[in-house]
Structure formats: structure tokens, C-alpha cells
Amino acid sequence: MTEYKLALVGFGGVNRALAQLIAERNQQWKTELGFTLKIVGVTDLFLGSVMNRHGLDAASLARLPASKGAMAQLPGGTVDALNEAVIKDCGADIIAEATFTNPVDGEPATSFCRWALERGKHVVTTNKGPIALHGAELKALARCNNVAFEYEGSVMSGTPVIRLAKQALAGSSITGFEGILNGTSNFVLTAMEGGLGFAEAVSQAQALGYAEADPTADVEGHDVRLKVVILANELLDAKLTVNDVSCKGISALSLDDIEKARRDNARWKLIGAATRNADGSISASVEPRLLSNDHPLASISSATNAVSFTSELLGAVTVSGPGAGRTETAFALLSDIIHIHQSATRKQEHTL
């Protein structure tokens, strides 16, 4: 049995949900998967930091109030966000990074990942910024230090589209994909089909926790553009930057557009797509598309996400699932940790 020491960077909904999963299921993982997780450090810009090489109680962390400086309530805790110290010095084997996405330069999350990889620590993250903007550098750094850099949760939260495509569809020669990759925009479009105007639909999404106070990144397609870069670079061997992906959001769609689509047996969807062209180049875009009701993505409603992969051997393969949610995204971090453990186990068996 292996025990992995874990540091949580960012302690909002996702890493808090991961702490709750550890509290509830650690013994189950020991029996079923052959490992347990021990939290040895937590740092958060708002809550502060705490470190203990002997381990922190996961249940107590999960119950911690979401109030400024709350980490100071714990033995050894402080109101200060000691990000670098926690990442470098708490003795963690794995860093679970779940801070906010900065679509401009990927900071500070990119630095958090870089510090960990340079110190020979595995990194699992749900953050789109570091992968979309600095993915090649960070993957090279991970290889150089013989550690893993995993980011399954960066595209569709707990729905394992990256690993499914790379493993289950390996050898099928994926030539492109198109997907509904943002739950907020899809919720807004579904609400508009129910008669709400755009502004009302956005307000409802905010009230339900699907949309941020500033919904621009979601409804204007910027969030999806980062995900298209990640998927295209990972699955199509592209070298795209965000500037290579044309981007148009849904804010210009009116109720008249939605109603006309209904009469024509079609639905508007915000689609992120990339395709390998005959000359080997990659075309990528984010835009509202009018899909006929028999299209595999047309039936995807509310905050659900889906992606349809096109391959030479299988044609179209469509995967749908939750594209948001604290527990679902925390599961993506767990999935990455399981992958790290299984890879390490195979290496050990190979050397025996």
C-alpha cells in the first residue's frame, strides 16, 4: 500500500470537495486502489495557509468556514497565503492545484505548477490557464524531472474526455472534434428556449451558481477557446495558441433567433471545434452554430457538456457528462492521482 502526501493549492469548492472525498473514502481507496492520501499542506489567497508533515485532518479541513484567514483557526495555521512555502517545503509528493483561471497569462497558477515540477513533485490541476498558455513548457519540465503533470479536469470537469480519447480511442486516428464545452453558455441557451431573454437567462445562471458575477468569459466563448487549445494540442498534435482560435460568443443571439431555430427543428449551441486539414494544418474556432435536431450535440441541454470526436476508423464518437460541479471536478483530480499511482505501480512491476 502506498501513501501519497498531498498539498492543496487553492481551497475553494473543488479542493474542499477533494478533502471531503479523502475524509469519506480514503479507506475504500486503500482496499480498492492500493493507496491512501494524506493532506500535509493547504494554501489559499483568502483563507490563509497551514502545513503539517504528519498530516492534517481532512474532515476538519472540509468543515473549515469559508471566512478570511480561517486557516489560522487550525494548529500551525496562518492568515497568510504562503503559496511558495507550502508547495516547496511541506513534504508533499503531489500538488493539487485548483485556483482561478487567468486567461491572459495563466498566473499565478503557472508559477505554482512550475515550482512544484521543478521540485520533483507531481501536479494535478483543473486550471485551464497553465495548460492552454504554457502547456508545452510545463510538460517538458515534468518530463525533465520525471514527474507527472495531469489536467483531466481542465476541459469537462469530471468527465474524462482527454484520457478517454488518448486511451480508449488510441489508434483510431482522431482527425477533429466539436463540442459543447461550457455549461454556463449552454444553460443560458436552454433557458432562452424556455422564453427568457439573454440577460434574464444569465441572471438565472448566476443565481444557480453556474455563472460568475462577470459572465463574459463564459458567454463570449473565451473559456471554450482555452479548452479548444488544450484538446487540439493534446489530441491533434497541434501547437495552437489562443490567438489561433477564432472566437465569437452567444450574446448577440436573440429570442427571435432561438424561436426561428425551434420552428426549423434546430437548436443554437456554442461549439468549440478543431479539425486537421488535408495539408496537416489545424483549423479551430468557437462560435454559435445552428444544429439540426438529429445532430449528436443538439440534444445536450442545461449545464451538461459533450464532445464529439471524429476519427478515421470509428467515425464520430460522442461523450457527454457534467461539465461543472465541485464534486465532479474534485473527482477529476482524484482520477489524475489514480493515473499517477497506476503508472508508478506498472513501473515498479516492470523493474521486478
Swiss-Prot record:
Enzyme nomenclature, EC number: 1.1.1.3
Q: Name one GO biological process term.
A: threonine biosynthetic process
Catalyzed reactions? L-homoserine + NAD(+) = L-aspartate 4-semialdehyde + NADH + H(+)
Q: Which domain of life is it from?
A: Bacteria
GO: which molecular function terms? homoserine dehydrogenase activity
Pfam families linked? Homoserine_dh (PF00742)
Please provide the record's keywords in A-Z order: NAD, Oxidoreductase
Presence of the UniProt keyword Kinase in the record: no
Q: What induces it?
A: Up-regulated upon growth on canavanine.
UniProt-listed SUPFAM superfamilies? Glyceraldehyde-3-phosphate dehydrogenase-like, C-terminal domain (SSF55347), NAD(P)-binding Rossmann-fold domains (SSF51735)
Q: What does this protein do?
A: Dehydrogenase involved in the degradation of canavanine, the delta-oxa-analog of arginine, allowing growth on canavanine as sole nitrogen and carbon source. Catalyzes the conversion of homoserine and NAD(+) to aspartate-semialdehyde and NADH. Is highly specific for NAD(+) and cannot use NADP(+).
NCBIfam families in alphabetical order: PRK06270.1 (NF004912), PRK06349.1 (NF004976)
- Which protein is depicted? NAD(+)-dependent homoserine dehydrogenase
The top of its lineage is: Bacteria, Pseudomonadati, Pseudomonadota, Gammaproteobacteria, Pseudomonadales
